[in-house]
Amino acid sequence: LMICSGLLPLMSGTYSSLYYDNTFYTLQKAMRGLKHSRSYLLTIDKVSTWNQGAVARSFGTDTIISYHDFKMTEAFGTHKRIGDASFFQQCREKIERGEVWKPGESVYMQFVTYSGHAPFKLPDHLRTITFPASIPEKAADYMTTAHYTDKAIGDFVAYLKTLPQYKETIVVIVGDHEGLASYRQELVGNPACRGLVSDKQLTPFIVLNSPVGMRYDKFMGQIDIYPTLLNLMQ
């Protein structure tokens, strides 16, 4: 809600259930107005999850690629969804087949990752880093999973850079919420996590191929992302 429409959440209840059919002035609609763009949502969730299908339509999404459109490989996590590496590989294949981002098409595409949710238990055959026994298990599991997702994103961005349209493409990497949640305070108090785990609930905001180059090391709010991206679209 904040990232796509610049609105603060409700004090109680969920907007996706209570106000999903409101009129929202979103990034998707702004892109359509500026570039006559087509908007895609790619997620391995079902459209019924958090009422994503109805919300996406209200946000101006033209095409939803969801749960039943992906092959269930690398399934893990509480709800047995596909891992982010397989997700991005299949997204790449959909681009190559022309299912999304057709040749000559101006697009707004939103890719929703999944693997970075608790309990952070990555299958052994997908693990590519290890940590010493002194690191608490929950912290090690989280960093292992984060590394897996980071690499999946990196591989996908490397693919995008091979496309001729990349020079006119902005890639935004952002989190909708922080990762450790209730585990954070426990890990912050552990001496082994000093320098690894922050006591602050932070999310990333990275813009690649931006028309304006800068690094901002102070704190900003998620509510600032929407106007920042609107400004970069101009």
PLM regions with names:
Residues L1-Q234:
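Solvent-exposed soluble domains appended to multi-pass membrane proteins
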